[in-house]
Amino acid sequence: MKRVLIMMLDSFGIGGAEDADKFGDKGANTLGHIASHQPSLNLPHLESLGLGLAAKESCGELPKHFQNQPHLIGGYAFAREISSGKDTTSGHWEIAGVPVLFDWGLFPDKQNSFPKPLLDRIVAKAGIKGYLGNCHSSGTVILDQLGEEHMKTGLPIFYTSADSVFQIAAHEETFGLNNLYELCEIVRTELEGYNIGRVIARPFIGNKAGAFKRTGNRRDYSVEPPAKTVLQKFIEEKEGMVVSVGKIADIYAHTGISKKVKATGLEELFDKTLEEVKSAGDNTIVFTNFVNFDADFGHRRDVTGYAKGLEYFDRRLPELLRLMKDDDLLIITADHGCDPTWQGSDHTREHIPVLMYGAQVPARFLGARETFADIGQTVAKYLGVSPMEYGTAII
């Protein structure tokens, strides 16, 4: 019986998106710009799976520090996104075979971002005295700006971004983690009709500006996908096991998930992934999201941190390869870009890498994929699930 291992390097785009100009992202290239800004970038194991060549096929240029003719042990491709947005939810859903062909609701105003009637209902339902923020911001900046005031007043911090999100930051100790989660559940309910993809709980600790730190107790409250993902169909049709490591379960609104494994940070995410692969039986999908590439490095525009994170992942990749059985299929991919050299702090519209490894995967270029949904269709075919509506199987 077969297993599929999906490693989602959150935000690890490889440039080249033909519609990037529509998003203000023409020229954005997460991998390419990391490579060009680093005096050295050593990713030999990802390179052997075709990362550099996938990037070259994507944008026409081999990233710095990569070889034109590496020793290939896996198949490689790049994929275009057909979903209307460049957000986490759209990318993950499309990868699972359900592209987002509608427009998410947004809060476009930089200040006073949320409608007053919505805020009034939230305040009344939650029994809070008010709120701080109500603006666009990156998570770390707003903590420095409003964290101390939040601790003094007890008012939660509301903020958003270019994505379809309503984010709430609150101190774990002075506000309380459960209080934050309960508030997020109220907001999720009140957002009905606004078509907002996620409410995100952003707990933090610390006692003064410059010392505040977000914790690993983040929680995403997503809407459910509009159709069955390959994960759901695998469970229903094949009685399969789907193991979520990290925030995968939250992104799919806990649909199509058999087991949830919490982990924080690249090291723990990799450790937990290895544990689950070791213990997983046949007929299993292990799906891990390495969120730190996005949250810690991409949004914070930390080129060096992103590069070091990639090198850490690459160093540990052989541990995963050694655990693979003859009938296992490994897919390493991303959900969007977040170029750490780009202006602002938002995601960037880019192609994603699709790196595949397994006994049945030819070591060659596997094509320019017209949708992320080709990944979901590949998983469906490999595991004997009925075909998805979107996508073409890669192998």
UniProtKB/Swiss-Prot annotation:
Catalysed transformations (reactions): 2-deoxy-alpha-D-ribose 1-phosphate = 2-deoxy-D-ribose 5-phosphate; alpha-D-ribose 1-phosphate = D-ribose 5-phosphate
Main location: cytoplasm
MF terms (GO), sorted A to Z: magnesium ion binding; manganese ion binding; phosphopentomutase activity
Matching InterPro entries: Alkaline_phosphatase_core_sf, DeoB, Metalloenzyme, Phosphopentomutase_DeoB_cap_sf
UniProt key word Manganese: yes
EC number(s) stated in the UniProt entry for this protein: 5.4.2.7
Annotated GO CC locations: cytosol
Chain residues that bind Mn(2+) 1: D10, D335, H336
Metabolic or biological pathway: Carbohydrate degradation; 2-deoxy-D-ribose 1-phosphate degradation; D-glyceraldehyde 3-phosphate and acetaldehyde from 2-deoxy-alpha-D-ribose 1-phosphate: step 1/2
Signal peptide: none
Protein name: Phosphopentomutase
Species, as recorded: Actinobacillus succinogenes (strain ATCC 55618 / DSM 22257 / CCUG 43843 / 130Z)
Taxonomic path: Bacteria, Pseudomonadati, Pseudomonadota, Gammaproteobacteria, Pasteurellales
Gene responsible for this protein: deoB
